[in-house]
Amino acid sequence: MAQEQAIDLDKLVSDKIEKRVAEVGLCLENKGLGDDEISRLAEMGILTEVTNLDLGENKISDQGLSVLCKSPFIKNLKVLNLKSNNITEAGARSIAQADNLSNLEQLILKFNRIGEQGAVYLAQSETLVKVTTLDLFRNRIGEIGAKAIKTSKVFRGVSRLRLD
């Protein structure tokens, strides 16, 4: 049985951070990151520079997402991509209640499992007011979740919306 190789998160972050004029992107898509790595990432001060964080196609669950959402270093995030992870309604609730995500403009959660209640949590958020792009494709949000998103006062400014 092969041992799973430990991820050198510091090296991965330094290799993958991309600085452009007025924005800094960190693409950690499909790197096998789980909750332990996301918890360590949440403690990295370099995140204060990051405006675009791509964590798609990893093994992040609600637990890791909760830690990330509480990080004081994510206040400058404008784009958060969490597609294809293991996020449920509890993770959606963490995002909805995260004061540190008040500058978020794009939230990509496609191919997760937030369900109806997760969509309702997002729709009732008091901090996601700057979101203009919201992608909840393949999250089983159903009619109740879709209605909550479409009628949400928080998401009035959304110009790009993708639901089930």
Please report, for each region that a protein language model flagged, where it lies by residue.
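Compact recognition or signaling/catalytic modules
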Residues: 26, 31, 99-107, 113-117, ...
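Inter-repeat linker/turn residues at the boundaries of leucine-rich repeats
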Residues: 21, 45-48, 72-75, 99-102, ...
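Conserved hydrophobic beta-strand positions in leucine-rich repeat
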Residues: 24-28, 51-55, 77-82, 104-109, ...
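Short, solvent-exposed loop/turn at the beta-strand->alpha-helix junction
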Residues: 5-11, 31-39, 59-66, 86-93, ...
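Leucine-rich solenoid repeat scaffolds
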Residues: 128-164
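Ankyrin-repeat helical core positions
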Residues: 42-43, 69, 96, 123
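The feature captures the LRR N-terminal capping module
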Residues: 1-39, 43, 155-164
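Alpha-helical adaptor scaffolds
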Residues: 54-103, 108
